[in-house]
From Swiss-Prot:
Residues 17-218 form the PNPLA domain. A motif (GXSXG) lies at residues 60-64. It comes from Arabidopsis thaliana. The keyword Transmembrane does not apply. GO terms for biological process: defense response; lipid catabolic process. This is Patatin-like protein 4. Pfam families: Patatin. Gene3D superfamilies: Cytosolic phospholipase A2 catalytic domain. A motif (GXGXXG) lies at residues 21-26.
Amino acid sequence: MFKNNKPPKYGNLVTILSLDGGGVRGIIGGVILANLEKHLQEIDNDESVRLADYFDVIAGTSTGGLMTAMLTAPNDSGRPLYAAKDIVPFYLEESPKIFYGSKWWDPSALWALFRPKYNGEYLHTRLGEILGETKLDQTLTNVVIPTFDIKKLQPTIFSSYHASVDPSLNAKLSDICIGTSAAPFYLPPYKFPENDKMRTFNLIDGGVTANDPTLVGMTAMSRKSIIKHPDMDGFKPLEYEKYIVISIGTGSAKREEYYSAVEAAKWGFENWAYNWKHKTTPILDIIFESSRDMVQYHTSVLFQALESEDNYLRIDADTLKKDEVFMDDSETLNLENLKNIGEKLLDTNVMRMNLDTYTYEPIPKTVNNDQELKRFAKILSDEKKLRNKTFKTMIDDSSNS
């Protein structure tokens, strides 16, 4: 399905956009997405173009899954429901209604010891209003959204490819978004459909599977090559040097130190689940961070081995403070601060993972993230034009024969 973008077989590259999970920290990613879309509009001199017009796959986990749906679900005119510039205002308005009373010193938050901190009712209702009956196979470009099924104890990956071969996976986007956002401790697991005669899903946050869904998105296109799907004619399954990947994070406090083995040796179940001293959820944080870090490590190794490091752009802020990383802090001051962090990140030098230390370091070239986004936007624009030209030539040749 390439409704707005001709498939890779008409061009030279495979283009992928990946969006991390992170709750309200999705605001950081929203700022980056808005700038990328603005660059594309400027390069192509067309304010109507959208990100879905340029990417073969948009992959998103948790809050990234929600952004994926916003960017790819069609409106009544067959265009994306939201422009990238609409994401941050959406989060600023809706986050306080989803994560109500989010401060830990609010006595009402104590009930999270016995049930999910939030009931999720507003999120469920709002997603239903926005996405309606739109199903996975109706998105304007391919999407991949990871979740985890707690009944089967295995990942469930919702993708355009899977939806095309297995009707039971062609679920409503609203259901998929609710499932991938159901972070343990914060929001209740989500079951759908209610009719047990059909295949049912019992889902929690996709972050326990792939908080950074970059490799999931790349694999989705590789799988098409393996089965020799016509969209991927001319591409071998492992030709990742022909992939253009933009991966956008939601921030972390990597420069901060957290727990010591001496301290954790005294913990029982309660402190691992929620640590009152640090006001954190250690086991959940560890799962999400390790999931994300390993994806970034393997992706970095892959592109380095192929001598194609310039094809992979990872934009993330690892300098957040501990009180800035809460996925549910919906206080106005925090939300505005996250927006400012995203804007400052654009002016920050491009970073790449040091494969020995797992930390991010500036690349030798002095170039900031916004400049690199503009370079990638030019590549995306050129690829789109090439595909359109090739397609038109083939149609013209066919008509003349």
